[in-house]
Amino acid sequence: MSEDARVVIIGGGVAGASIAYHLVHRGWEDVLLLDRGELTSGSTFHSAGLVGQLRSTLTLTRMMMYGVDLYRRLKEETELDPGWHEVGSLRLASSEERMEELRRLSGWGKTFGLPLEIISTDEALERFPLFDPDGVIGAAYLPTDGWLDPSSLTFALAQGARAGGAQIRTGARVTGIETDGGRVRGVVLGEDDRIRTDIVVNAGGIWAHELGALAGVTVPVIPMAHQFLVTKPLEGVRREFPTLRDPDLLVYFREDAGGLVAGGYERDPASWGLDGIPPDFNHRLLEGDWPRFEPLSEGAMKRVPSLQTAEIVTLINGPEAFTPDGEFILGESDVRGFFVAAGFCAHGIAGAGGVGRLMAEWIVDGEPGMDAWKMDIRRFGSHYRSRRYALERTHEIYSTYYDIHYPNEERRAARGLRLSPAYPRLESLGAEFGEKSGWERPNWFRSNEQGSLEEWRPRGWAGRHWSTAIPKEHLATRERAGLFDETSFAKIEVSGPGACAFLQRLCDNHVDRPVGMVVYTSMLNSGGGIECDFTVTRLDDDRFRIVTGTAFGDHDLGWIRKHRPDDDVRVRDLTSAYACLGLWGPQARDILQSVSDDDLSNEAFRYMRAREITVGQVPCLALRVTYVGELGWELYPRMELGIRLWDTLMEAGRPHGLIPAGYRAIDSMRLEKGYRVWSADITPETDPLEAGLGFAVKFDKGVDFIGKAALERKTSEGPSRRLCCLVLDDHTAVALGNEPVRAEGEIVGRVTSGGQGYSVGASIAYAYLPAELSTPGTGVEVEVFGRWEPARVTQEPLFDPKGDRIRS
């Protein structure tokens, strides 16, 4: 039997129901929602149901805030009560470090528009008098948080979806996803029932990995056994109790029918179902694991002593889909039309409303309405095909869920996977490695530490994962030269007869330039937002190389392939084919020329040019570009020649004072030079004009590039806000992102990125401010861990404003 549907959603949990609800509200009626059992019978029915809105990113916080707004009005719309209890939330602090975390959260709350308050222990007790205040030094209170009944919410959303024309079919087990030519063509049910469709949404919860495999898509979710207990009614418990979290004890609480729910995130988590989930696992729980729950039980009884005598109704133990980085997995995969909405890390109830709206936008409009990068499925590289790798990373995420996560903190799990050719040399030089997209990358070198630079140590948390080697490497590069291993940079080749025309349509800059030219450009979405930014080098008439950030390779590849017109254009990922070393500084030319017979003079090899050269015995592609604001080159040899190139340059550079340097020095130098970071300073929600990148937009290149019409409208109106460079009065007060900025007592913006500029002697922060406040000299304040730091808008770039050094 065959039938047709415009979109098929697989998974009748709260996410699937929300997506169906929001699709019909966008006018799509031919929506089919399938579930292998009954609605909510996977993970939704056993969720604890807590709703906390404040998250680490603006997008996720906005999604949660939208969800609360939806839950408030859903009963009136659908005539079904979602069980929303807007009782507020309390988060306790039992240490000064935890109190610092709450102060930081308070700043984020101001930035995101949430009424988060820092309150005293006594004020917290007034709201939840059953907790023992011993050791508690304060709390954060958010009155608009709460909790709801997961099943009631799902049924209300499903009712709203049905009212809009959606069909819901239970007992429908998906056994196949049909694809052809890299896109979805249909869904197979049971033995041979087929549904023809061009769009499938995998909202399969703990089955999302298995469903993804049917389409050849890796969805790295790991089912984790999550436990909480439920008590009978307790004396003193009131319905209006706020939810309570004590992260230092790893536990959370909420009221339930006069009793309490108490759960948490243990240090020794248990995964489940990795060898396959039983086919009859519908509306079922796992057996309670009291030995594993005991540390949480002890913490819960310590904080709420009345639990010691409470009658326990049950210990709920249910699998929840977690991800290797603790973020949702959303968006369209490499298989066109196959969307994923999974891996909600026990926050699917809180996120359901926002997930439904975002996914509906993505499906209907072809793009999400917000910057969804941190949740985009394209953030996961091919190494996540390994279940062992995903499992190890996910275990770490779960076990450290309630830990304080300090700025620039590095993950420890599943390290040492992707190594550059020079890795042994970096290790021998005392590299302090960080990890990005599986690559080991030097943040700094312990061999460069210098005590006299201790005066630069940032105040508070920003000084935790910091070293005097960072300013040493920065200053040495500015004064002499630094050698940087950038092998992890993603490299993409676009080739074929139609390559140039294709890139002209995708890029806002003019890339149809002579062979050997390097162009900085963005790729925009239909609204003029920046989807990608990178350099494009023309290697031949029909061959171009794109170099983009380590973490953005799969994202940018996905965007390019999504718009690839036909077989006249070939797109290849060359990241693992070539190493990359960056050599920068005033001595860079002398060092490189000493080991190359090629003419590297300014007249022969100008800025933003590229050509093949030989360095010692190593042939490589040399790009005269910079991300640090200094004379120099990026050198791209074949991967197997990378270590020889490193050795050649280090030996040649010794008489010139060359030092190995890391990514933290790069970041401080790019701040001084005003170079933007995609995903922070520029995103799909920001356009080149307000970001100060209008110089790279070529309206007159004779091509209607994607986003051009939207940018032309913005040009005629003029930017309402601008990305501004702020200098804080105190060079040890470092803003790292999301801190609020105020002028005359009013919140006017938030920090996108920040750090220290050691050459200019300042703490630097970037923030979007209203256009009327963007004039250099304007005074503002930036809140850094609860203290308002004076700052001023400055003309950028702070370092080498005329660009003389990079063109020398």
PLM region spans:
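Beta1/beta-strand and adjacent pyrophosphate-binding region of the FAD-binding site
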Residues: 2-15, 32
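Flavin-dependent oxidoreductases
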Residues: 18, 177-288, 295-307, 385-410, ...
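Glycine-rich FAD pyrophosphate-binding loop
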Residues: 24-44
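Central beta-strand plus flanking loop segment that forms part of the substrate or channel wall
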Residues: 48-53, 89-91, 215-239, 295, ...
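Dinucleotide-binding Rossmann-like beta1-alpha1 core, especially the glycine-rich loop
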Residues: 49-127, 248-253, 257-259, 280, ...
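Flavin (FAD/FMN) cofactor-binding and adjacent substrate-gating region
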Residues: 70-73, 85, 94-164, 169-170, ...
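C-terminal catalytic lobe of FAD-dependent flavoproteins
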Residues: 248, 287-405, 410-414
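Glycine/proline-enriched, intrinsically flexible loops and inter-domain linkers
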Residues: 370-371, 377-808
